[in-house]
Amino acid sequence: VPNVSYTADPTWAGHMDLAMAERYQINHMWFAYNYFPTVSLGDASFETANDAKAYLNNNDVSVFKRLITQTTANTYMLVISHVQIPAIDNEHLASNSKAIITDWLRHELGYNGVVMTDRVDVGALQANQKIGDFVVNSIVAGSDLVLLDADTGHIDEVHRALTQAVANGTISNDRLNDAVKHILLMKMQTQLQQ
């Protein structure tokens, strides 16, 4: 997607991303690759999840596959977009989809690092949900961090929702520990490089 990428050419975009990653790593900085699995599908539509994945695997996701295998593990995050891909998950945006975050990104593509949402106020609006509910759904689906705006009301709402979701078991201890592990591994990797 030219307006948020270096180029629409996946090969060239991968070269540029890897060059930038090298500079961030040399300077011990965390960074994120945006936006998995894509920003927009445009006019594309698919009959099955396999059709959607085949199309994306040959386009936008091909860059992420390369970045996952060629960037030092635990030095970067992947940002999940709020795109909806009905053929893969008819009910959820990518940022709330276990089928996309856990099943596809983590299990099929082998990504074990930090997954961060795009701005959750935007995603909640798109999904017609309260921000707190949207964030809880995203963490349950496999995100580790959520990107918030500076609205203190949103921050308080998210804190309350996450605290309650952990207390009532909506977010399992295993899922919480997994998210914390991803974040700590990134922190440790950065310290090891210094």
What are these regions (language model features)?
Residues 8-170:
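Second-shell residues forming the walls of enzyme active-site clefts
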Residues 1-6:
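Charged, often glycine-rich, active-site loop that binds/positions anionic groups
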Residues 161-164, 170-193:
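Mid-to-C-terminal alpha-helical segments outside catalytic/metal-binding sites
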